[in-house]
Amino acid sequence: MRPAEQERPPFWQRRPGLRVERHRATMAHLASVYPCHTDASLGDRGPYIGVNVTGGASGWFFDPFELYGHALTNPNCIVTGDIGSGKSALVKAFLRRELAVYGRRRMVTILDPKGEYTPFAAAHDLPVIRLHPGGTDRLNPMDHRGERTETHRRQNLATALVSGVLGRALDATEDALLGWAVSTLARTGRTFTIADVAATVADPADDLVALSRRSPLELAQAATPVVFALDKLLTRTLAGMFDGPTSVRVDWTNGPGFVIDLSAVYDDEDALPLVMLAATSWLAASLQRHDDRRVLQIIDEAWAAVRHGARHFQGSLKLSRTYGVSTWLVCHRPADLSAQTDDGTAIAKISSGLLSDVQTRIILRQPPDQVPVAAELFSLSERERGWIGQLARGRALWRLPSHGAVVQTVLTETEKQLCDTDTAMST
């Protein structure tokens, strides 16, 4: 309590200083002004990311595999932010530090639709697989991975690709015919390609005709849309990229990883989602055959990967824990993962449901119209909702199941040149 006015000594006898009123408050409020307050963050295991702005400027360290089992129950991440928010720099700096901290215990695979990871790949000895129509590098999304469910995976992939070309779901006969073709080829035990699937559909074996309970002419008529769709995939959309056996060699045992450059088809809005679907399928099948290393899988422009293959892609995410793969979905807006099929259908619900398989949400600055969308998708508090529209460049809200913090990514001078896309463009 402040002493009564008559009890105060004359001003020449008073000690210098500022008289402060007594105030009582809880630590929930005082933590924001108390200079010695720090947040334990997530511990110090994993590479250093930056400064925990909401935790007294303590360090922020992160590795999805180190946190698995106590802070996380799945290793997948989503990174979303407006253009120029520092999204690309954060991801590249994280990958660079993962390779520096863990060496060959980590493998980095990057699906790069825009071709912006080429300098990063050169600096870290990551080979670049450049896919373009008429090229020499080919990946076979029908490659076998030795699982009992392999036939089912390949059937789903074929269905997703053909549905994407047709722009509609397959009817019962089309779906059955395509499934029969894949299972027939799978039973041979030999490696087959999409071209083999097309040939089998166009000229079905007698047992397939008998199984369909239709005449050869009726079956041929029913199969016509599928035949034309597969022909378009092989002669245009996937030509020279996914129409033959895998021709690239990857060091799965000791190599640091690789980049798949899809920039040749980035401007083709019809082809890019199908190419992304085929590439992610090949990547998932390959990674699941080599499960002795922890893998960081980056899917840039993730909206394209789920546009036609949400169900197929969700299946891969669910297997991340089994095969030691942390998938990072990178997009401008969180709504990108659901807006492609936001029509109330089962596929739309699956697209939105992808977020349930992603426990680490890294949200950089959002444009005003996306703040309500992000708040709903990520179940943000009112305070967090206010933050994400005002975050400074390089600053992100990290949301984990039991922890949340605003973190400023800290870049070295080398990383600013190598990882920061905007800096590289301005120099």
Where would I find each of the regions flagged by the language model?
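P-loop NTPase motor domains
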Residues: A31-T54, T118-P127, P133, N140-V325, ...
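Basic- and hydrophobic-enriched, low-structure N-terminal and domain-boundary segments
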Residues: M1-T80, T414
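Structured core elements
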Residues: Y48, F61, I78, T109-I110, ...
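Conserved P-loop NTPase motor cores
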Residues: L72-S85, K92-R96, L111, S263-W387, ...
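Short helix/loop capping segments that flank catalytic or ligand/cofactor-binding pockets
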Residues: W60, H70-L72, S88, P119, ...
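P-loop NTPase motor core of the ASCE superfamily
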Residues: E150-D196, D342-T427
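Switch/connector loops and helix/strand junctions flanking conserved nucleotide-binding motifs
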Residues: Y117-F120, D137-N140, D336-Q340, Q370-A374, ...
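Glycine-rich phosphate-binding loop of nucleotide-binding enzymes
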Residues: P47-P133
